Amino acid sequence: MSKEIKFSSDARSAMVRGVDILADTVKVTLGPKGRNVVLEKSFGSPLITNDGVTIAKEIELEDHFENMGAKLVSEVASKTNDIAGDGTTTATVLTQAIVREGIKNVTAGANPIGIRRGIETAVAAAVEALKNNAIPVANKEAIAQVAAVSSRSEKVGEYISEAMEKVGKDGVITIEESRGMETELEVVEGMQFDRGYLSQYMVTDSEKMVADLENPYILITDKKISNIQEILPLLESILQSNRPLLIIADDVDGEALPTLVLNKIRGTFNVVAVKAPGFGDRRKAMLEDIAILTGGTVITEDLGLELKDATIEALGQAARVTVDKDSTVIVEGAGNPEAISNRVAVIKSQIETTTSEFDREKLQERLAKLSGGVAVIKVGAATETELKEMKLRIEDALNATRAAVEEGIVAGGGTALANVIPAVATLELTGDEATGRNIVLRALEEPVRQIAHNAGFEGSIVIDRLKNAELGIGFNAATGEWVNMIDQGIIDPVKVSRSALQNAASVASLILTTEAVVANKPEPVAPAPAMDPSMMGGMM
């Protein structure tokens, strides 16, 4: 395919047009009075949303050069979403502001490399000032505030803070669609995995069809148990202790399963068998997690262990285990707290180093199961369109809350970015680097200007007053009042503001230093073939 190439100002101008088209579409959603954007979907009803990254991903422009500019801004939104989970619209607004001011100076003859150095220095100073202004988020009320601001719903704020209190900041909180119209929170304590009993005759409550084991021993192995003789010595030891047994194995079949069921029905002992969770290497890791949580040992050939030699000391223990036809929940495992902490640290380091989004998700699930449990927020709504929009809002709120717990909070509504302007202004830079600093100074005002504009106020008047206000005092665009933003619960996580600024500066600098753009040349549309004259006989 042949290529089309543009150079210097032509290349940058085309990309800037794309930046402006995407940013102008996204920035109308910023702030408490931001508008919605309707996205056409190939199937089903349109999606109505105010989520910046969702809108950015949907935009495809016909002009290849403009589309590249739009895609670079979309990348800023996606990257900010990946790191902080929120702040995608702020990142888009900042990118547009830096690009717009930067292009003016580059066109006037400034050196883009010098400008880039100035931008990087100014952003580093702004980030440092943001961190210095941070307030730690420690209690349930502060967590609820952050979530309520992001989701624009106090009820959602309560659900998220309650979920984080129950499962911890490392716990898994999933968002699912409810069957009804109400949004509700469901918490599963302990370690849960998606494997149920191998025989319904193992249940202890035939009405609920669940097996409840109090203070059980837990046999953990990656082997298949087909011959009951392999575990007979172990079963005899457990029989003497008069405690129930949970068997987690690759499978239990052959004569072993009916023998266990028969002894359960006769009341000889209480036993439940389930298949091991996961597959392949992930299965081995999950079995090791269960062993550490319960204080047991995985009976595996990798460690040179055989089932027939296993003793009661190799078994794990827990306060309670509940098994239904689809899942198993282990509550209060008897594992060594130090060993569990070490395992958690190992999984955290794996999360940081993995490049696969799927692997990261699975590692976070394992981390949550070791840390204390899983919370599920079931989202309910009257229509499918409302449900999709609400689900996106709750996902943003959850991510923002996690970011707040991690790095603290600052005044929201763009106030925090305006508050760091003095720290950036004091940087002593010269020439084009000073120009880069001034570009960042102007960009830091832009979120406040846009929030005010979306609420029907004059942005320049608001920013002028904000520059002279005390730290933390800001403009509440929802009411039109000047208030202490922290006291009013109008807050942003530091991680969100920091990531938005850093990612915006990074991509904007790349656009400013672009000298040539190569795009695919549009293929000429082939003319429709002429109709065969012999087929026109009946038309005369």
UniProtKB/Swiss-Prot annotation:
Its EC number is 5.6.1.7. The keyword Acyltransferase does not apply. It is found in: Cytoplasm. Pfam families: Cpn60_TCP1. GO terms for cellular component: cytoplasm. Belongs to the chaperonin (HSP60) family. Together with its co-chaperonin GroES, plays an essential role in assisting protein folding. The GroEL-GroES system forms a nano-cage that allows encapsulation of the non-native substrate proteins and provides a physical environment optimized to promote and accelerate protein folding. PANTHER family: 60 KDA HEAT SHOCK PROTEIN, MITOCHONDRIAL (PTHR45633). It catalyses: ATP + H2O + a folded polypeptide = ADP + phosphate + an unfolded polypeptide. ATP binds at T29, L30, G31, P32, D86, G87, T88, T89, T90, G413, N476, A477, A478, D492. One of its GO terms (biological process) is protein refolding. Transmembrane segments: none annotated. This is Chaperonin GroEL. Forms a cylinder of 14 subunits composed of two heptameric rings stacked back-to-back. Interacts with the co-chaperonin GroES. Keywords: ATP-binding, Chaperone, Cytoplasm, Isomerase, Nucleotide-binding. It comes from the Bacteria. GO terms for molecular function: ATP binding; ATP-dependent protein folding chaperone; isomerase activity; unfolded protein binding. Its main location: cytoplasm. The keyword Glycoprotein does not apply.
